[in-house]
Amino acid sequence: MAESAGASSFFPLVVLLLAGSGGSGPRGIQALLCACTSCLQTNYTCETDGACMVSIFNLDGVEHHVRTCIPKVELVPAGKPFYCLSSEDLRNTHCCYIDFCNKIDLRVPSGHLKEPAHPSMWGPVELVGIIAGPVFLLFLIIIIVFLVINYHQRVYHNRQRLDMEDPSCEMCLSKDKTLQDLVYDLSTSGSGSGLPLFVQRTVARTIVLQEIIGKGRFGEVWRGRWRGGDVAVKIFSSREERSWFREAEIYQTVMLRHENILGFIAADNKDNGTWTQLWLVSDYHEHGSLFDYLNRYTVTIEGMIKLALSAASGLAHLHMEIVGTQGKPGIAHRDLKSKNILVKKNGMCAIADLGLAVRHDAVTDTIDIAPNQRVGTKRYMAPEVLDETINMKHFDSFKCADIYALGLVYWEIARRCNSGGVHEDYQLPYYDLVPSDPSIEEMRKVVCDQKLRPNVPNWWQSYEALRVMGKMMRECWYANGAARLTALRIKKTLSQLSVQEDVKI
């Protein structure tokens, strides 16, 4: 009621304040001088027999400061004059009785600082919807997650049950069969294309991973244990599924197995209930890649010949087409380099990483090129690949590109040959001509435009083995792919050299 009364009396007061109630007249003995905001003619000063007043209020969003005089007759009721009262929400007023005592500044009423309250726009139906909607959505998400997890667990357990119930799997993998027995079975199998798929799956799911031994753009390589023997497990990231599928497919090509090609054991997409791992299991070679081996060790002339001859033998077998019922298509590697060749315990090479390989069907004369986003290693690309003049419809073009890369690998091996106490530090091909990670444009400029090749030192001429290696390299590096040596020709030349040097292979 007090606030309503204050509000109803506010506007007459505003009129009074804005108009100014003070006047200027002859000053009496007891007259009081006050500041007056509306007394322009008397220098903003008024005189009264009552009180000085200062007030601040907000009118239509505009802040007003009023100072004036209140006559004594208007100071009613006595003791608590109406004009001197403040209202918390409307105005702040102060009366005083000393000359110019109203020259003080008052605070704006707190009510004017508050935002006006808006009536609620939500009815009961809307409020129920706002509360129930998120609850229902959360409940739905929980159900979906539960169903997905339950589905994966059922699939996983069903696969385990099927593997356990498969009698042929039990016959093939008896408890006393070791890794050596399995490798022997693979080597002597009639098809030469690897184990049956259900056996591969069983082997892959009983491997225990031991340690990570390498990383690449495809994923990781682990050393694993299976029945007392070491195996290499290449684990592909999920985005590299095409590479995994392609490499597994190439490794299981009929009649592919060869002592100088990495021994394939199994491939499996392991579903552990929440995500899928893509595994490719192969023989384990503790020396690692040829790149790692040459970085750590120098080689003798005998060691150089063994590495070079075994690499040529593996590549010749890849390139070879075997005609017949159990025939083998010709295969080109397309990413041959020292990091994709492994060194076995006996000092021989095994060609690995067939994810980019292509197969040639001699009957239809077609080339099986898988849709894969990967490209070969730029440093090892042949001139015709760099300048994009390679004939993609002619299988021999891919074989010639492999030979060019093999010549670069031979250069890496020969540099580390310790002859008469002389050897050179390990370096990648073109190390002195391009940066560590060259672009295709940088390689094209060096290889195609400037026609440069790795340097063959003159002192190699003093040793027959190095002289032959240097001559072969140059014949592998011809700009014209058709003029390069074949893998079979290289193999025969190195076989003759091994006899001359009395190298026991």
Curated annotation (Swiss-Prot):
<feature type="binding site">
    <location>
        <begin position="213"/>
        <end position="221"/>
    </location>
    <ligand>
        <name>ATP</name>
    </ligand>
</feature>
<dbReference type="GO" id="GO:0005524">
    <property type="term" value="F:ATP binding"/>
</dbReference>
<keyword id="KW-0812">Transmembrane</keyword>
<dbReference type="GO" id="GO:0031625">
    <property type="term" value="F:ubiquitin protein ligase binding"/>
</dbReference>
<dbReference type="GO" id="GO:0018107">
    <property type="term" value="P:peptidyl-threonine phosphorylation"/>
</dbReference>
<dbReference type="GO" id="GO:0009986">
    <property type="term" value="C:cell surface"/>
</dbReference>
<dbReference type="GO" id="GO:0032927">
    <property type="term" value="P:positive regulation of activin receptor signaling pathway"/>
</dbReference>
<keyword id="KW-0460">Magnesium</keyword>
<dbReference type="GO" id="GO:0007498">
    <property type="term" value="P:mesoderm development"/>
</dbReference>
<dbReference type="GO" id="GO:0032924">
    <property type="term" value="P:activin receptor signaling pathway"/>
</dbReference>
<dbReference type="InterPro" id="IPR000333">
    <property type="entry name" value="TGFB_receptor"/>
</dbReference>
<dbReference type="GO" id="GO:0048179">
    <property type="term" value="C:activin receptor complex"/>
</dbReference>
<dbReference type="GO" id="GO:0006355">
    <property type="term" value="P:regulation of DNA-templated transcription"/>
</dbReference>
<feature type="domain" description="GS">
    <location>
        <begin position="177"/>
        <end position="206"/>
    </location>
</feature>
<feature type="transmembrane region" description="Helical">
    <location>
        <begin position="127"/>
        <end position="149"/>
    </location>
</feature>
<dbReference type="GO" id="GO:0004674">
    <property type="term" value="F:protein serine/threonine kinase activity"/>
</dbReference>
<protein>
    <recommendedName>
        <fullName>Activin receptor type-1B</fullName>
        <ecNumber>2.7.11.30</ecNumber>
    </recommendedName>
</protein>
<keyword id="KW-0325">Glycoprotein</keyword>
<dbReference type="InterPro" id="IPR003605">
    <property type="entry name" value="GS_dom"/>
</dbReference>
<keyword id="KW-1133">Transmembrane helix</keyword>
<dbReference type="Pfam" id="PF08515">
    <property type="entry name" value="TGF_beta_GS"/>
</dbReference>
<feature type="active site" description="Proton acceptor">
    <location>
        <position position="335"/>
    </location>
</feature>
<comment type="similarity">
    <text>Belongs to the protein kinase superfamily. TKL Ser/Thr protein kinase family. TGFB receptor subfamily.</text>
</comment>
<feature type="glycosylation site" description="N-linked (GlcNAc...) asparagine">
    <location>
        <position position="43"/>
    </location>
</feature>
<dbReference type="GO" id="GO:0005886">
    <property type="term" value="C:plasma membrane"/>
</dbReference>
<dbReference type="GO" id="GO:0046872">
    <property type="term" value="F:metal ion binding"/>
</dbReference>
<dbReference type="InterPro" id="IPR000719">
    <property type="entry name" value="Prot_kinase_dom"/>
</dbReference>
<keyword id="KW-0597">Phosphoprotein</keyword>
<dbReference type="GO" id="GO:0038092">
    <property type="term" value="P:nodal signaling pathway"/>
</dbReference>
<dbReference type="InterPro" id="IPR000472">
    <property type="entry name" value="Activin_recp"/>
</dbReference>
<feature type="signal peptide">
    <location>
        <begin position="1"/>
        <end position="23"/>
    </location>
</feature>
<keyword id="KW-0418">Kinase</keyword>
<dbReference type="GO" id="GO:0097191">
    <property type="term" value="P:extrinsic apoptotic signaling pathway"/>
</dbReference>
<dbReference type="GO" id="GO:0004675">
    <property type="term" value="F:transmembrane receptor protein serine/threonine kinase activity"/>
</dbReference>
<dbReference type="GO" id="GO:0010628">
    <property type="term" value="P:positive regulation of gene expression"/>
</dbReference>
<dbReference type="Pfam" id="PF00069">
    <property type="entry name" value="Pkinase"/>
</dbReference>
<dbReference type="GO" id="GO:0070411">
    <property type="term" value="F:I-SMAD binding"/>
</dbReference>
<keyword id="KW-0832">Ubl conjugation</keyword>
<keyword id="KW-0732">Signal</keyword>
<dbReference type="GO" id="GO:0001701">
    <property type="term" value="P:in utero embryonic development"/>
</dbReference>
<feature type="topological domain" description="Cytoplasmic">
    <location>
        <begin position="150"/>
        <end position="505"/>
    </location>
</feature>
<keyword id="KW-1003">Cell membrane</keyword>
